[in-house]
Amino acid sequence: MNQHVSIHEGDRLAKRNALILTGAQALGGANPAIIVSLGGLVGTQLASDKTFATVPVSLLQLGIAAGVIPAAMLMRRLGRRGGYLIGALVGASGASVAAAGVVTRDFALFCLGTFICGLYGSFVQSYRFAAADTASPAFKARAISWVMLGGLAAGVIGPQSVFWTRDLTPSAPFAASFLAQGALALLAILVVSQLHAPPVAAVKADRGRPLGEIMRQPKFVASVIAALVAYGLMSFVMTSAPIAMVACGHSVGEAALGIQWHVLAMYGPSFFTGRLIERFGKEGVTIAGLALTALAAVVGLSGLSVAHFWIALVLLGLGWNLGFIGATSLVTDCYRPEERVKVQAANDFLVFGSVAIASFSSGGLVSHGGWDTVNWMVFPPVAIALGLVAWQRFQRKAAPAAV
């Protein structure tokens, strides 16, 4: 009876935290949505060499990768709530620097701003793990899915902020959009201040197994590779798409709307992704997400109309949702409670490091190789990730007693 009450109370806290983090994700998730919508376009205006147009977006991803380990160390010392409050302040500062770069037409300053915004993103990306920290095993996948659902609102808030503010500063187009981004980060402070996370002392009591031992687990390897392929390819194609659309004669508005539909597709399925995982398993959902990513590339290779771009971007978003949430859920099975901080940080460093590399390479590739080349590059990594996850699924079903 007492055990039942404990589990019930634990999931009550987990649900409360998941809802708070969903709101924080809605505000913090607008941070990359705004930079992805505008980064390449502003980069084209400010960079002397158009090959570097996507560098601001790439630096956003690099900032996320660079920030995950310091963010984890900070949260280990201050707790989740303290770390997230500092992260939101960093986000507001980065947006202000980016706006200053636009106003002064200083490409380097603008890039610095997007990098700092990436540091904020490293905190935001850990919201999904924070939601799982207090959840029972039965509720973990759904808690992660709830938080990712906040990105659905971010997919509206970010692009709509651009539409509402882009013309407020005619002498410095889009500067007001980045100031709005900073205001959203400040609003996130009010939300994350309500978070009740486990005491840091509970994490410090036992450091668990060495990180190398954990990372050598075949399941961890398959999970991380699936996550970095799902996220890396999404960033790779998404960063190239607006540039390719404009190069094909489509309008900036059509490109921005394509990104909005893409972001909505990224987070919209979170209404039911947790239930899909309960029904079909973590590996099954991850495999479905990777297959949708490959299908997006097939559509991208089929034509250059607005419809082709939009459908490809929607499929890409759906694939990211299923693939990344499924892979994240798999990662949570690879560590003990006392190991979570270091394993989550290692996972995110690997994932967002690959995303940064993908984003850096996409600008030059779409400029010199074209949109078709970008899409052909999708298939090899998807095949590798599919093989690894499918093998793990086969192993689990073949030896259920060992699980």
Model-derived regions, located:
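C-terminal membrane-cytosol helix-exit motif in multi-pass small-molecule transporters
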Residues: 162-163, 182-202, 388-393
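Intracellular juxtamembrane helix-capping segments at the cytosolic ends
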Residues: 39, 121-135, 322-335
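Juxtamembrane intracellular "pre-TM" segments in multi-pass secondary transporters
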Residues: 2-15, 196-225
